[in-house]
């Protein structure tokens, strides 16, 4: 779902087969009334047609708003139809150019999705100073941080969040450079009456992951979406909630949507009622064995989770999975709203 203007959104979806071949099963783009999550009543921009499973091509029906039958555009199934229509869509009318604008907007938003999976072992080495675009595994974190710290406000934000993690107080961040213009970052930690500089080679996995996560949210373009795999991995349980809170504040400030994944029951048990509105559960469905997402609040009788002790406990004893796969008759839990 992408904001178009004050009245309308763009609703894009794609269904991909991963059985014998990886290719497009279904794909569509609609213009819908702002806030609606259903396609009924929406304006079709394009939608693929059903094809035989063996065909390597797929037809996309394009709504040109002309009298008669909508034209079909032939596309390959091995890549996104959306990306192909960028060059295959006709450019003869205002309607054509309007729809191309919608497609460009969706593609632009998809490009702003940044998946972060920091690998601490790859972050403990010198890198080229000019390598300042953060990579998925964060191997070039030292160059990214050096560039980031040229902005005093961003450096201040970074140190404020990172200082909450280790036992020793972090006073500053520094950089060691070579004659060949390679760089490695270091943290200055304060002890009782002294301080010491520790380069990335000596820092813990948790500290490196935290620094990478904060650096990402401070450097990616505003309006982006940041996906962080296993947010709590390597970070002490007592610090994770503080990190998530700080990330949430930073994300709101920079208009960045943050998607976190976790399997940590302790972290999930600590989620408050308002936070659960943003939680989705990923599970494997029985028929095809594929993974599906469902918003937590869309699970029938989800308040039972709180009766049992919390979201984390429900995940451990599989009662959460049972609520999804074997929903019982909906019960009245309005009495819980007072808690």
Write out the residue ranges for each language-model feature.
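Conserved nucleotide-sensing/catalytic segment adjacent to the nucleotide-binding pocket
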Residues: 1-4
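Electropositive, glycine-dotted interaction segments
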Residues: 8-160, 164, 168
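Short beta-strand segments
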Residues: 8-12, 196-198, 291-294
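A short, sequence-level motif marking secondary-structure junctions
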Residues: 15-21, 44-46, 202-206, 296-301
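Short, low-complexity Ser/Thr-rich regulatory SLiMs
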Residues: 16-20, 177, 283-286
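Conserved ABC ATPase signature
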Residues: 140, 163, 167, 171-218, ...
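Residue-level preference for the first positions of well-ordered beta-strands
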Residues: 223-225, 257
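C-terminal lobe/lid and adjacent interdomain/linker elements of RecA-like ASCE P-loop ATPase modules
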Residues: 242-339
């Amino acid at each position: 779902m992408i904001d178009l203007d004050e009245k309308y959104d763009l609703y894009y979806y794609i269904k991909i087969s991963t059985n014998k071949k990886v290719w497009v099963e279904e794909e569509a783009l609609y213009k819908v009334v702002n806030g609606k999550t259903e396609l009924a009543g929406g304006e079709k921009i394009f939608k693929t047609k059903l094809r035989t499973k063996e065909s390597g091509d797929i037809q996309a029906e394009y709504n040109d708003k002309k009298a008669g039958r909508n034209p079909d555009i032939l596309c390959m199934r091995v890549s996104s139809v959306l990306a192909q229509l960028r060059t295959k869509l006709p450019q003869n009318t205002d309607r054509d150019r309007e729809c191309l604008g919608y497609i460009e907007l969706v593609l632009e938003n998809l490009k702003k999705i940044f998946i972060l999976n920091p690998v601490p072992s790859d972050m403990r080495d010198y890198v080229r100073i000019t390598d300042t675009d953060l990579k998925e595994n964060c191997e070039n974190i030292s160059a990214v941080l050096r560039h980031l710290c040229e902005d005093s406000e961003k450096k201040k934000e970074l140190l404020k969040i990172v200082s909450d993690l280790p036992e020793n107080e972090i006073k500053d961040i520094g950089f060691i450079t070579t004659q060949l213009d390679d760089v490695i970052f270091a943290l200055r930690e304060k002890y009782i009456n002294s301080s010491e500089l520790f380069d990335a080679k000596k820092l813990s996995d948790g500290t490196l992951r935290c620094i990478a996560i904060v650096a990402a949210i401070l450097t990616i373009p505003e309006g982006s979406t940041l996906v962080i795999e296993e947010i709590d991995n390597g970070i002490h349980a007592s610090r994770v909630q503080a990190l998530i809170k700080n990330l949430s504040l930073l994300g709101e400030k920079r208009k960045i949507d943050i998607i976190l994944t976790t399997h940590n029951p302790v972290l999930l048990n600590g989620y408050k009622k308002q936070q659960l509105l943003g939680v989705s559960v990923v599970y494997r469905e029985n028929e095809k064995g594929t993974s599906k997402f469902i918003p937590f609040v869309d699970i029938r009788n989800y308040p039972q989770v709180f009766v049992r002790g919390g979201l984390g406990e429900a995940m451990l004893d599989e009662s959460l999975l049972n609520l999804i796969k074997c929903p019982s008759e909906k019960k009245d839990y309005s009495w819980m709203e007072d808690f």
